[in-house]
Amino acid sequence: MKYNPRVTSSRRRNRKPHFTASSSERRVXMSSPLSTDLRQKYNVRSMPIRKDDEXQIVRGTYKGREGKLXQVYRRKXVIHIERLTREKVNGTTVNVGVQPTKVVITKLRLDKDRKSLLERKAKGRAAADKDKGTKFTAVDVMQNVX
């Protein structure tokens, strides 16, 4: 949904910034959702994906495959997962590119910068949850369902 009338949502105008995005902008665009365990633990929904994270593919041909991230290829906007390869016609094996949106992060590689990012995102989310008044309680919803 569009909130700011001064920001365009036109496909035509958004294509150029998308394809000419810098590496730092692509890092944010190449985010993946966290698994339900990590989401409850850190109170964060998604994170920019990085090299030594572990992930599981949730959509596409390779659905269900898990592994450690071998490479985050920002220029092509794909990620390579270890042991996810295919054989070319000439016999060489190549890594298969997967879009980061089709992957769920199951294990994070944490360093001090990433921990601070998690804390910052969780703090913002907690503030938003506090402001949001729940109109109905879980009991009210369940009574209406039955």
From Swiss-Prot:
Residues 9-18 have a biased composition (Basic residues). It comes from Brassica campestris. Pfam families: Ribosomal_L26. Residues 1-33 are annotated as: Disordered. GO terms for molecular function: RNA binding; structural constituent of ribosome. The lineage of its organism: Eukaryota, Viridiplantae, Streptophyta, Embryophyta, Tracheophyta. It comes from the Eukaryota. Keywords: Ribonucleoprotein, Ribosomal protein. GO terms for biological process: cytoplasmic translation; ribosomal large subunit biogenesis. This is Large ribosomal subunit protein uL24. GO terms for cellular component: cytosolic large ribosomal subunit. Belongs to the universal ribosomal protein uL24 family. The keyword Transcription does not apply. PANTHER family: 60S RIBOSOMAL PROTEIN L26 FAMILY MEMBER. SUPFAM superfamilies: Translation proteins SH3-like domain.
